[in-house]
């Protein structure tokens, strides 16, 4: 469809570093490797797998797209001789696009690179936390755990359960110093998008999911004792 209609495919891999899936030929495909998308985007926000304070990354297998992204990153400016329209000396540069300042500082880049050394261990710890959550909530009426399949290695940026009384559980957990969160409010319900005609009821399945989803604490430094406390409080509320 993308080829037929001249569309770009952008893979949102912000929650997926280290994740992979098996394609139809049984080949492992890592998220963001460009196997089906023109480019992929990653986030380096403080709560993501790799953090640089703020920022992100775009990956692509296209040299043409790479050159354009480099322009957008630095105010639309280039000094690459191969891309210049004119040549006036080594100092010369051109503004060829309406770009912005999306440059990551060297300090932030160094911080991100240093975290690559523990990225695998962090991902393994996330899987251990998920296993413990799943085992604890297995068979408990009123708690729906995340769905996954054998051909996918999930990055588990979040651990999201679904419950009937999401607001009640959210409040109960916060009262007991468990900082659960909701991910995410549907975009079509936001005021900005509603001005373009989007309305509640347009996406009923999305809205149904939103009414019941709740993210539990999920980060590599979460201790077993802390997780047991979270589990205890969730089960306490659901059992009421």
Where are these regions (language model features)?
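Conserved active-site segment immediately N-terminal to the catalytic lysine
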Residues: 11-51, 91-96
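Residue-level detector of structured alpha->beta connecting loops
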Residues: 6, 36-38, 141
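PLP-dependent aminotransferase class I/II
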Residues: 8, 16, 20, 24, ...
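Glycosyltransferases and closely related glycan-assembly transferases
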Residues: 1-5
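Active-site PLP attachment segment
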Residues: 35-79
């Amino acid at each position: 469809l993308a080829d037929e209609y001249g569309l770009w495919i952008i893979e949102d891999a912000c929650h997926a570093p280290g994740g992979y899936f098996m394609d139809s030929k049984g080949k492992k495909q890592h998220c963001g490797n460009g196997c089906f998308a023109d480019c992929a985007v990653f986030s380096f926000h403080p709560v993501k797998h790799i953090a640089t304070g703020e920022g992100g990354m775009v990956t692509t297998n296209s040299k043409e797209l790479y050159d354009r992204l480099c322009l957008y990153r630095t105010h639309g400016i280039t000094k690459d001789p191969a891309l210049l329209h004119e040549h006036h000396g080594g100092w010369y540069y051109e503004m060829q696009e309406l770009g912005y300042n999306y440059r990551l500082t060297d300090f932030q880049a160094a911080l991100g690179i240093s975290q690559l050394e523990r990225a695998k261990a962090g991902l393994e710890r996330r899987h251990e936390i998920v296993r413990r959550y799943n085992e604890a909530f297995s068979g408990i009426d009123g708690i729906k755990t995340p769905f996954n399949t054998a051909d996918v290695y999930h990055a588990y940026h979040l651990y999201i359960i679904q419950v009937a009384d999401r607001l009640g559980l959210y409040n109960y957990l916060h009262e007991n110093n468990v900082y659960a969160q909701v991910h995410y409010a549907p975009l079509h319900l936001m005021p900005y998008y509603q001005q373009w005609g989007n309305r509640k009821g347009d996406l009923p399945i999305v809205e149904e999911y939103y009414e019941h989803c709740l993210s539990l604490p999920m980060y590599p430094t979460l201790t077993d004792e802390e997780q047991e406390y979270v589990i205890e409080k969730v089960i306490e509320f659901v059992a009421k």
